[in-house]
Each structure stands twice: as C-alpha cells, then as structure tokens.
C-alpha cells in the first residue's frame, strides 16, 4: 500500500447530519493510471471526488497522494495546494467569460510559459481554436465539454478527477468525444479518476474499474 500513487482509506463524510460517504477505500497503484468508479446516481461518487479534491473535509479515514496525507480527521490541505483538477458534470463554464478565459481560469499563479505551451497543445488536440472567442451560450454541448476538459488539463495536474464527463453530451456526439477523451488521457499520462454510471464508458475509458 505504501507505494500506491493514491490511497483512499476508510473515508467517512457527513453533511447536514447525514452520512454521504461511509467507509470508502480504494487505491490507484501507478501514476498515469485511468481508474473508473462505476455506480448508480446518488450513491456518493461525486462526493468522493470532492473529498479527494479538498472541497469537502472528511470526518474519518485518510486520503494520501505519493505518501503524503492530504486529508484526514486532523489534516486538511486546501484545494489550491493539492494540484488536483476536478471537471464537474455540468461543465461549470463561467457564462460571462469566453472559452479562452474559461480555459485559463485558475492558472494565474502557474508558470505562464508552461501554461501557454500546454494550452496551445490541448486547444489544438480538442479542436477548440475556432471557438476561443465565443461565450458558453454560443457553443454546443460537445464544445462546452471539450472546453471543460481543456481547463482541467491545462495546469498539468498531478491528478485529474472527471465527474460524469459525458453525461450532458448528446448521444450523437458521445462516441466521438469518448474516443477523443481516451486519446487525450493516454497522451497526457495524467493519473485520472472518472466516475460514471455508464458501464460501457467505464470499461472503454478505464485501465481499471471499481464498482461502488
């Protein structure tokens, strides 16, 4: 266990007096692995991602990355200090910013030269160049999903968390984006955890899958 890239150990999380996650444990063995967590809606998959990202403080257990505890009952490293990116299910693009500014949000304190290089490569790979000056209401659901992925990847995080990344994409675009996403994750070699209720998606995208 000590050599695992990520360890989630017996994690409990409560909110509003209710238990949202209880005694959850899993691990990611190697950097670059793509892990899919498969389970029905409402079971706590998103909450697990939020605890890993540091958006929620756990009540019991621990979360460890590269042998460093980032969450426990007594320890809570803030989200901005974790180098973890979380792409939400609803894209969460800011409506008053264009696509380019949405992609670069949160990179202000990063190395500008590296961010510029990363952004250029990701934008080209995801075919976003033509919509950089457009606003979220002017683009398709598929383009919005690609923009959200670009934002999550541009800072080159240690860990990428994807919450139902294709759930809001029209079925006619879904297969195309699945292929693009798999290629992008393989190319980036960023350790990734994807939560989904779609078994085909889980086994297509993931190098390993777990059922919650």
Protein language model features and the residues they cover:
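Conserved ABC ATPase "signature" region
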Residues: 114-131, 183
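Catalytic Walker B motif of ABC-type/P-loop ATPase nucleotide-binding domains
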Residues: 160-164
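Conserved ABC ATPase signature
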Residues: 135-139, 143-145
């Amino acid at each position: 266990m000590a050599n695992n890239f990520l360890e989630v150990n017996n994690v409990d999380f409560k909110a509003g007096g209710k238990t949202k996650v209880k005694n959850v444990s899993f691990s990611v063995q190697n950097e670059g692995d793509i892990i899919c967590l498969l389970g029905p809606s409402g079971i706590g998959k998103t909450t697990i991602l939020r605890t890993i990202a540091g958006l929620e403080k756990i009540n019991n257990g621990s979360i460890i990355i590269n042998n460093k505890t980032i969450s426990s009952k007594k320890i809570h490293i803030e989200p901005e200090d974790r180098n973890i990116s979380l792409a939400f299910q609803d894209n969460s693009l800011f409506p008053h910013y264009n696509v380019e500014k949405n992609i670069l949000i949160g990179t202000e304190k990063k190395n500008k030269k590296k961010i510029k290089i990363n952004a250029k490569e990701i934008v080209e790979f995801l075919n976003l160049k033509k919509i950089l000056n457009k606003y979220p209401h002017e683009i398709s659901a598929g383009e919005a999903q690609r923009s959200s992925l670009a934002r999550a990847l541009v800072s080159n995080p240690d860990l990428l968390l994807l919450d139902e990344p294709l759930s809001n994409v029209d079925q006619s675009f879904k297969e195309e984006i699945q292929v693009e996403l798999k290629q992008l994750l393989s190319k980036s070699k960023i350790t990734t955890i994807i939560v989904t209720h779609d078994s085909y998606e889980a086994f297509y995208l993931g190098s390993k899958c777990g059922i919650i």
